Amino acid sequence: MLLAFDWTQLAQQIVIGLASGGVWATLAVALVVIYRSTGVINFAQGEMAMFSTFIAWSLVHHGFSYWGAFFLTLAISFAGGVAIERAVIRPVERAPVLTVVIVTLGLFFVVNGAARWIWSPETRSLPNAFSTRPIDVAGVAFSISDLGTIAVSLGAVALLWVFFRFTKLGLASRAAAVNPEATRLVGVRVSWMLALGWGLAAAMGAVSGMLTAPALASFDQNLMQPILLYAFAGAVLGGIDSPLGAVIGSLLLGVLVNLLGTYVDWVGSELRLPVALAVILGVLLIRPAGLFGRPVEQRV
Amino acid sequence: MAEPLLELEDVTARYGPVTALHGISLRVDQGESVAVLGANGAGKTTTLRAVSGTVRRSGKIAFGGKSIARTAPEAVARAGIAHVPEGRGTLTELTVRENLRLGAYTRRDRKAVAGDERRVLSYFPQLAQRGSQRAGTLSGGEQQMLALARALMLRPRLLLLDEPSLGLAPLVVAEIFRIVRELNEREGLAVLVVEQNAVVALDATARAYVLEVGKVAVEGTSADLQRDEAVRRSYLGY
Amino acid sequence: MGRRALGIALWVAVVAVILVAYAFAPRLVSDFHSRDLAEAGIFFIAIVGLNLLTGYTGQISLGHGALMAVGGYTTAALMVHEHWRDVWTIPLAGLTAGVVGFLIGLPALRLSGLYLAMATFAFAVAMPSLLRKFSGLTGGGQGLRMLEDAPLQITGLSGTVTIFGHSMTQNHFLYYLAWGIGLVGFLIAWLIVRSRVGRTFRAVRDSEVAATSAGINLAWTKTFAFAISGVYAGVAGGLLATQNQIVNPLTFTFLLSIVLLVGTVVGGLGSLPGMVVGAFFVEYLPDVSTHVSTAPGVPDFVYGAAIIVVMILLPTGVGGLLKRVARPLTTRLYLRP
């Protein structure tokens, strides 16, 4: 029975799942960065990523190579994230959490509307970052595109990790997220750390968008909405305050959703997301803080 | 007379509609260690917050001759005032070493910072052993030491200490105040310490102010206050 | 005349104004706009319920649109399959949604904050798919069309409705029905908030640990809060179905859950009067946005910008503003000089 099972297909589906999961992971990490620093889920993260993708498209349209556009878009997205935080989040820095959540919801519409207005609703496409040829690894055919996506996603996340772990600014940023009052007292401009967080999150979102778009024949302003849902789910699965959790959660989710879609018949494309969400709910009921989240300690 | 390092004149402070300080005046001279005493709610913590800029305040507040009455907390730290807040402000998610490194955030002299890390840890050998431990797992006394060490990494000219004895066993408290005294005497670090435990505080400082309901009720040298029975009984509780 | 009498007189005056406004508002607007007013009333009911859950008990829900769906589909199914008259389905719509709300509240016992939001969000996202799946009951992707399949059950299909001898247009009837239920719902919510249950809600919101130490049963409180807010959402959903005379999976998407949350926060968490403003805000903002321009993307941009600006100017919602304004007035009334 074991020999009759198609291991090749399993391996291939796992890699495909990891590729989707990788894209979700970069957006999920963006969500976690903002959650840790600002305390809210940025509902506009997907739309910001979409906007970045359109900027990339415009650059390519004006003659830039894919990778040239990629890095320039990262820089522009970073600046955009900082600007958004200063303009829209800073005024509600001291407001209740739900107020800030509603602001991000408003931002969702603002960014989406702006993207629709600047770039007309016709569909577009972004060239593929990697060649679409298959590559042979241990006798199994994988798509270079998938492997490349996984590499870039994980690479981006790793760079972010290095920043937070090993640089002075990264340390200050982490401290500001943990205890802004005490961090202020050592001379850190906590407010700007927030802006930095938003800039980095926007850049990560841009990576996510620019990896998503080429895989589709064409894309429009609705590009990132499903990605946001999956990224949110992956982050929650892994533990919303843990960047590592967000990555692992998203990768797992990617593989799970893909395997479910491949092997379980009644899970058509309709039910992929609800079933994934049901699984996550199941996990949460056993581990309420997610797989890697730290259980909330109650100070009595 | 030399200019005081820190000077407060007729300072008021409030939390929203509630006024906590009703015009207090105090000073700390270069290299001096001064205590601020008083009962709960007297305004001791608020006084430190007024200096570091973490509460709404008005009045004259000068550090090294320059006014800091309108300065934001980040800039006050940069000016050379290290505030160890009430509750220690430990960055629990970071390691001990990271907490220390953060203390030196405003400094640019990397070699000196490394040297300072060694020097500071020599005062707190317990911390040296726990370099890569998560700060949240330290005991109360160790966290207090870490907070103090982190403040020292700033190379401050003035140290603001808020209720260092809170929640700690007497032996630990004695140890901390011994270190504070050593820092003051050996390195000439000016200290303004707020304490409910008057006994320990008066032992470790040269002068003291006693606050009552947001005003300075008594001031004098620590030695005098220790000897004054009337003051001790009415204001210091012993 | 003492201060107390003055206070009571003020209350009577406020109630009188409200009742007069309720009775005469449709005269001031066209028949067509009565429909919008009715829809505002429907939102009002839903967000009063959501406020009880989120504003007073501190539990986040991103799934109240799905609870409205439960109510709306209950109404539609009863009309189409069981031939109930539309208005009589409303209580059952509320009840069914209340039960589902209770069930949703169960994860709340284990999850908190963001994770609870996730659970309710999962429910909201899954709802359209679930509705499509159980097509026998729900009519699948087509939904249920009361106009075609249950016309006799629709009140006022002929265009006029006669109640107690008065006759009025169908739109006016819907307005009076929606806001009538809304006022009753508001009164009930107000009584709940002022009662011991209300204090229990607030205790859970402010500190679960403290509440538990005071002997409050967290499980009961949370699930009750979910259930009762579910009832409100279900009633609102049933009214929406009655008004539209059709339900399908697209009527109750995740967007509706968001709109309800926006309405609640803009109105003011923990403030019931603010919910009136919140309801009108979410009802009329889309229209206003389209009025500015119909160029692609601009209505959305305006919609989002309006939300952001309101939140920046009024971080605690309209209710927060009302409280700040009313405090010196009421303090003066009730305190000695």
Question: What residues fall within each predicted segment?
Answer:
Chain B
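Glycine-rich phosphate-binding loops of nucleotide-dependent enzymes
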Residues: 2-238
